[in-house]
Protein backbone atom coordinates (compact mmCIF):
# COMPACT_ATOMS: atom_id res chain seq x y z
CA UNK A 1 0.00 0.00 0.00
CA UNK A 2 1.38 3.42 -0.98
CA UNK A 3 2.30 5.95 1.72
CA UNK A 4 -0.17 8.62 2.83
CA UNK A 5 0.32 11.76 4.91
CA UNK A 6 -0.97 10.28 8.18
CA UNK A 7 -0.31 6.58 7.67
CA UNK A 8 0.52 4.39 10.66
CA UNK A 9 2.09 0.97 10.96
CA UNK A 10 3.18 -1.81 13.23
CA UNK A 11 6.31 -3.94 12.91
CA UNK A 12 4.63 -6.34 10.49
CA UNK A 13 3.39 -3.78 7.97
CA UNK A 14 4.44 -0.83 5.82
CA UNK A 15 7.51 1.06 7.06
CA UNK A 16 7.47 -0.96 10.28
CA UNK A 17 8.14 -4.15 8.32
CA UNK A 18 11.37 -2.64 7.01
CA UNK A 19 12.56 -2.25 10.62
CA UNK A 20 11.87 -5.94 11.14
CA UNK A 21 13.70 -6.81 7.93
CA UNK A 22 16.74 -4.80 9.03
CA UNK A 23 16.70 -6.58 12.40
CA UNK A 24 16.59 -9.91 10.54
CA UNK A 25 19.62 -8.77 8.54
CA UNK A 26 21.41 -7.92 11.80
CA UNK A 27 20.66 -11.44 13.01
CA UNK A 28 22.17 -12.83 9.78
CA UNK A 29 25.24 -10.61 10.22
CA UNK A 30 25.64 -11.67 13.86
CA UNK A 31 25.86 -15.32 12.75
CA UNK A 32 28.58 -14.59 10.16
CA UNK A 33 31.91 -16.46 10.54
CA UNK A 34 33.68 -13.15 11.21
CA UNK A 35 30.87 -10.92 12.44
CA UNK A 36 31.16 -7.16 12.14
CA UNK A 37 28.44 -6.69 14.77
CA UNK A 38 27.02 -8.62 17.72
CA UNK A 39 23.30 -8.11 18.21
CA UNK A 40 21.99 -11.00 20.35
CA UNK A 41 18.53 -9.41 20.54
CA UNK A 42 17.89 -9.12 16.80
CA UNK A 43 16.66 -12.68 16.24
CA UNK A 44 14.36 -12.90 19.30
CA UNK A 45 12.81 -9.52 18.48
CA UNK A 46 12.14 -10.62 14.92
CA UNK A 47 10.67 -13.90 16.14
CA UNK A 48 8.34 -12.00 18.45
CA UNK A 49 7.03 -9.89 15.56
CA UNK A 50 5.84 -13.16 14.06
CA UNK A 51 6.26 -12.60 10.31
CA UNK A 52 7.24 -16.02 8.97
CA UNK A 53 9.65 -14.83 6.26
CA UNK A 54 11.62 -12.63 8.64
CA UNK A 55 11.59 -15.26 11.39
CA UNK A 56 13.04 -17.93 9.11
CA UNK A 57 15.68 -15.51 7.86
CA UNK A 58 16.65 -14.35 11.36
CA UNK A 59 16.95 -17.89 12.73
CA UNK A 60 18.85 -19.30 9.73
CA UNK A 61 16.07 -21.62 8.59
CA UNK A 62 15.99 -19.59 5.37
CA UNK A 63 19.51 -18.79 4.14
CA UNK A 64 20.71 -15.85 2.12
CA UNK A 65 22.04 -18.34 -0.44
CA UNK A 66 18.51 -19.63 -1.03
CA UNK A 67 17.18 -16.12 -1.46
CA UNK A 68 19.99 -15.07 -3.78
CA UNK A 69 19.71 -18.06 -6.14
CA UNK A 70 19.17 -16.81 -9.69
CA UNK A 71 19.23 -13.31 -8.32
CA UNK A 72 22.03 -11.89 -10.44
CA UNK A 73 19.82 -9.18 -11.92
CA UNK A 74 18.53 -7.94 -8.58
CA UNK A 75 19.61 -4.46 -7.42
CA UNK A 76 20.94 -6.15 -4.28
CA UNK A 77 20.85 -9.74 -3.02
CA UNK A 78 20.01 -10.64 0.55
CA UNK A 79 23.60 -11.54 1.45
CA UNK A 80 24.81 -8.11 0.32
CA UNK A 81 21.86 -6.48 2.07
CA UNK A 82 22.98 -8.16 5.30
CA UNK A 83 26.54 -6.92 4.71
CA UNK A 84 25.29 -3.39 4.12
CA UNK A 85 23.17 -3.48 7.27
CA UNK A 86 26.09 -4.86 9.29
CA UNK A 87 28.33 -2.01 8.15
CA UNK A 88 25.57 0.52 8.76
CA UNK A 89 24.93 -0.80 12.27
CA UNK A 90 28.63 -0.78 13.10
CA UNK A 91 28.97 2.80 11.84
CA UNK A 92 26.31 4.03 14.25
CA UNK A 93 27.66 1.85 17.08
CA UNK A 94 31.10 3.37 16.58
CA UNK A 95 29.61 6.85 16.36
CA UNK A 96 28.05 6.53 19.80
CA UNK A 97 31.26 5.11 21.27
CA UNK A 98 33.29 8.01 19.89
CA UNK A 99 30.70 10.57 20.98
CA UNK A 100 30.84 9.28 24.56
CA UNK A 101 34.60 9.86 24.57
CA UNK A 102 34.24 13.40 23.22
CA UNK A 103 34.45 16.64 25.12
CA UNK A 104 34.78 18.58 27.17
CA UNK A 105 31.96 19.05 27.81
CA UNK A 106 31.12 15.34 27.83
CA UNK A 107 28.10 14.10 25.92
CA UNK A 108 25.75 12.31 28.28
CA UNK A 109 22.49 12.26 26.38
CA UNK A 110 21.69 10.55 23.10
CA UNK A 111 18.66 10.49 20.84
CA UNK A 112 17.74 7.67 18.46
CA UNK A 113 15.21 8.92 15.93
CA UNK A 114 12.74 6.30 14.62
CA UNK A 115 14.42 3.63 16.73
CA UNK A 116 12.42 0.62 15.49
CA UNK A 117 13.97 -2.61 16.77
CA UNK A 118 17.27 -0.89 17.62
CA UNK A 119 18.59 -2.50 20.83
CA UNK A 120 21.59 -0.24 21.49
CA UNK A 121 20.15 0.75 24.85
CA UNK A 122 20.49 -2.92 25.83
CA UNK A 123 23.54 -4.25 24.00
CA UNK A 124 26.08 -1.39 24.11
CA UNK A 125 28.14 -0.20 27.08
CA UNK A 126 27.33 3.33 28.24
CA UNK A 127 28.74 5.80 30.78
CA UNK A 128 27.06 5.53 34.17
CA UNK A 129 25.41 8.96 33.90
CA UNK A 130 24.16 8.50 30.33
CA UNK A 131 20.51 8.87 29.30
CA UNK A 132 19.26 7.58 25.96
CA UNK A 133 16.03 8.75 24.34
CA UNK A 134 14.28 6.54 21.79
CA UNK A 135 11.65 8.13 19.54
CA UNK A 136 9.16 6.06 17.57
CA UNK A 137 5.48 5.28 17.21
CA UNK A 138 3.86 4.11 20.47
CA UNK A 139 3.10 0.56 19.32
CA UNK A 140 6.70 -0.01 18.20
CA UNK A 141 8.22 1.15 21.49
CA UNK A 142 5.72 -0.77 23.62
CA UNK A 143 6.31 -3.98 21.69
CA UNK A 144 10.09 -3.78 21.92
CA UNK A 145 10.15 -2.98 25.64
CA UNK A 146 7.70 -5.77 26.46
CA UNK A 147 9.52 -8.34 24.34
CA UNK A 148 12.92 -7.60 25.85
CA UNK A 149 11.44 -7.56 29.36
CA UNK A 150 9.96 -11.00 28.72
CA UNK A 151 13.47 -12.15 27.78
CA UNK A 152 14.71 -10.89 31.14
CA UNK A 153 16.81 -8.17 29.52
CA UNK A 154 17.27 -4.76 31.11
CA UNK A 155 18.67 -1.60 29.50
CA UNK A 156 22.38 -1.00 30.09
CA UNK A 157 21.72 2.73 30.53
CA UNK A 158 18.91 5.02 31.61
CA UNK A 159 16.37 4.72 28.80
CA UNK A 160 13.55 7.17 28.11
CA UNK A 161 11.08 6.17 25.42
CA UNK A 162 9.32 8.98 23.57
CA UNK A 163 6.17 7.67 21.92
CA UNK A 164 5.50 10.16 19.16
CA UNK A 165 5.38 10.20 15.38
CA UNK A 166 8.15 12.35 13.90
CA UNK A 167 5.47 14.09 11.81
CA UNK A 168 4.03 15.50 15.05
CA UNK A 169 5.53 17.78 17.72
CA UNK A 170 8.33 15.45 18.75
CA UNK A 171 10.58 18.19 20.23
CA UNK A 172 7.89 18.94 22.84
CA UNK A 173 7.50 15.24 23.63
CA UNK A 174 11.28 14.89 23.89
CA UNK A 175 11.50 17.83 26.30
CA UNK A 176 8.69 16.36 28.40
CA UNK A 177 10.68 13.12 28.65
CA UNK A 178 13.59 15.03 30.21
CA UNK A 179 15.72 16.08 27.24
CA UNK A 180 18.02 19.03 28.03
CA UNK A 181 18.56 21.23 24.97
CA UNK A 182 21.30 23.17 26.78
CA UNK A 183 23.51 20.05 27.02
CA UNK A 184 25.42 18.48 24.12
CA UNK A 185 23.66 15.55 22.48
CA UNK A 186 24.59 12.60 20.26
CA UNK A 187 21.87 12.12 17.64
CA UNK A 188 21.43 9.28 15.16
CA UNK A 189 19.01 8.99 12.24
CA UNK A 190 19.62 5.48 10.93
CA UNK A 191 17.64 4.24 7.94
CA UNK A 192 15.24 7.16 8.23
CA UNK A 193 15.69 9.84 5.59
CA UNK A 194 14.58 7.73 2.62
CA UNK A 195 11.17 7.34 4.26
CA UNK A 196 10.76 11.12 4.58
CA UNK A 197 9.67 13.48 1.80
CA UNK A 198 12.54 15.82 0.83
CA UNK A 199 11.03 18.83 2.61
CA UNK A 200 10.48 16.77 5.77
CA UNK A 201 14.16 15.77 5.67
CA UNK A 202 15.13 19.43 5.73
CA UNK A 203 12.75 20.20 8.60
CA UNK A 204 14.14 17.29 10.62
CA UNK A 205 17.74 18.41 10.16
CA UNK A 206 16.79 22.00 11.00
CA UNK A 207 15.04 20.90 14.19
CA UNK A 208 18.00 18.79 15.26
CA UNK A 209 20.19 21.84 14.74
CA UNK A 210 17.90 24.00 16.87
CA UNK A 211 18.05 21.45 19.70
CA UNK A 212 21.82 20.89 19.52
CA UNK A 213 23.99 22.69 22.04
CA UNK A 214 27.67 23.31 21.19
CA UNK A 215 29.59 20.04 21.23
CA UNK A 216 26.64 18.02 19.94
CA UNK A 217 27.16 15.32 17.32
CA UNK A 218 24.93 13.86 14.63
CA UNK A 219 25.19 10.70 12.53
CA UNK A 220 22.86 10.17 9.62
CA UNK A 221 22.53 7.95 6.58
CA UNK A 222 22.24 10.19 3.52
CA UNK A 223 20.29 8.88 0.53
CA UNK A 224 20.99 10.24 -2.96
CA UNK A 225 18.70 12.54 -4.89
CA UNK A 226 16.68 10.89 -7.64
CA UNK A 227 15.79 12.96 -10.67
CA UNK A 228 12.36 12.49 -12.19
CA UNK A 229 13.72 10.64 -15.23
CA UNK A 230 15.33 7.99 -12.99
CA UNK A 231 12.53 7.45 -10.50
CA UNK A 232 10.44 4.96 -12.46
CA UNK A 233 13.49 2.81 -13.24
CA UNK A 234 14.51 2.79 -9.57
CA UNK A 235 11.02 1.88 -8.39
CA UNK A 236 10.96 -0.98 -10.88
CA UNK A 237 14.28 -2.32 -9.58
CA UNK A 238 13.02 -2.15 -6.01
CA UNK A 239 9.85 -3.98 -7.00
CA UNK A 240 11.93 -6.68 -8.73
CA UNK A 241 13.82 -7.33 -5.49
CA UNK A 242 10.55 -7.67 -3.58
CA UNK A 243 9.07 -9.98 -6.24
CA UNK A 244 12.11 -12.30 -6.24
CA UNK A 245 11.65 -13.02 -2.54
CA UNK A 246 7.87 -13.27 -2.69
CA UNK A 247 7.94 -17.02 -3.38
CA UNK A 248 9.55 -17.44 0.06
CA UNK A 249 6.76 -15.49 1.75
CA UNK A 250 8.15 -11.94 1.51
CA UNK A 251 5.25 -9.49 1.31
CA UNK A 252 6.72 -5.97 1.30
CA UNK A 253 6.95 -3.73 -1.76
CA UNK A 254 9.82 -1.32 -1.11
CA UNK A 255 8.83 0.80 -4.09
CA UNK A 256 5.68 1.94 -2.26
CA UNK A 257 7.41 2.91 0.97
CA UNK A 258 10.18 5.35 0.06
CA UNK A 259 10.00 8.94 -1.10
CA UNK A 260 12.09 9.58 -4.18
CA UNK A 261 12.70 12.90 -5.91
CA UNK A 262 15.31 15.59 -5.58
CA UNK A 263 16.45 16.25 -2.04
CA UNK A 264 19.17 18.25 -0.33
CA UNK A 265 22.61 16.74 -0.05
CA UNK A 266 22.92 16.15 3.69
CA UNK A 267 26.65 16.88 3.79
CA UNK A 268 26.24 20.29 2.16
CA UNK A 269 23.04 21.05 4.05
CA UNK A 270 24.64 20.51 7.45
CA UNK A 271 27.88 22.25 6.55
CA UNK A 272 25.94 25.32 5.38
CA UNK A 273 24.28 25.43 8.81
CA UNK A 274 27.43 25.45 10.87
CA UNK A 275 28.19 21.76 11.36
CA UNK A 276 31.66 20.30 10.82
CA UNK A 277 30.96 17.33 8.58
CA UNK A 278 32.67 14.08 7.60
CA UNK A 279 31.15 11.88 4.88
CA UNK A 280 31.92 8.19 4.27
CA UNK A 281 30.64 6.43 1.12
CA UNK A 282 29.12 2.98 1.59
CA UNK A 283 31.96 1.12 -0.12
CA UNK A 284 34.56 2.84 2.01
CA UNK A 285 32.59 1.77 5.07
CA UNK A 286 32.31 -1.83 3.85
CA UNK A 287 36.05 -1.96 3.21
CA UNK A 288 36.77 -0.50 6.66
CA UNK A 289 34.94 -3.42 8.25
CA UNK A 290 36.45 -6.10 6.03
CA UNK A 291 33.40 -6.57 3.78
CA UNK A 292 33.39 -6.69 -0.02
CA UNK A 293 32.36 -3.46 -1.75
CA UNK A 294 29.15 -3.20 -3.74
CA UNK A 295 29.03 -2.78 -7.49
CA UNK A 296 28.07 0.72 -8.54
CA UNK A 297 24.62 -0.40 -9.72
CA UNK A 298 23.77 -2.38 -6.57
CA UNK A 299 21.34 -1.02 -4.03
CA UNK A 300 22.88 1.07 -1.20
CA UNK A 301 26.06 1.74 -3.21
CA UNK A 302 25.21 5.45 -3.43
CA UNK A 303 24.36 5.87 0.25
CA UNK A 304 26.73 8.11 2.23
CA UNK A 305 27.22 7.96 6.00
CA UNK A 306 27.56 11.38 7.56
CA UNK A 307 28.88 12.34 10.97
CA UNK A 308 28.79 15.96 12.06
CA UNK A 309 29.86 18.06 15.04
CA UNK A 310 28.24 21.29 16.20
Curated annotation (Swiss-Prot):
* One Pfam family this sequence matches: LCM
One example GO MF annotation: methyltransferase activity
Q: Which UniProt keywords apply?
A: Methyltransferase, S-adenosyl-L-methionine, Transferase
According to the UniProt record, what class of enzyme is this?
A: transferase
InterPro entries associated with the record: Ppm1/Ppm2/Tcmp (IPR007213), SAM-dependent_MTases_sf (IPR029063), SAM_mthyl_Trfase_ML2640-like (IPR011610)
One GO BP annotation of this record: methylation
Tell me the superkingdom of the source: Bacteria
UniProt binding sites for S-adenosyl-L-methionine: 136, 165-166
Enzyme Commission number(s) from the entry:
2.1.1.-
Function of the molecule: Exhibits S-adenosyl-L-methionine-dependent methyltransferase activity.
The similarity annotation says:
Belongs to the UPF0677 family.
Q: What is this protein called?
A: Putative S-adenosyl-L-methionine-dependent methyltransferase Mvan_1346
| Species for this entry | Mycolicibacterium vanbaalenii (strain DSM 7251 / JCM 13017 / BCRC 16820 / KCTC 9966 / NRRL B-24157 / PYR-1)
Starting at the broadest rank, the lineage of the source organism is: Bacteria, Bacillati, Actinomycetota, Actinomycetes, Mycobacteriales
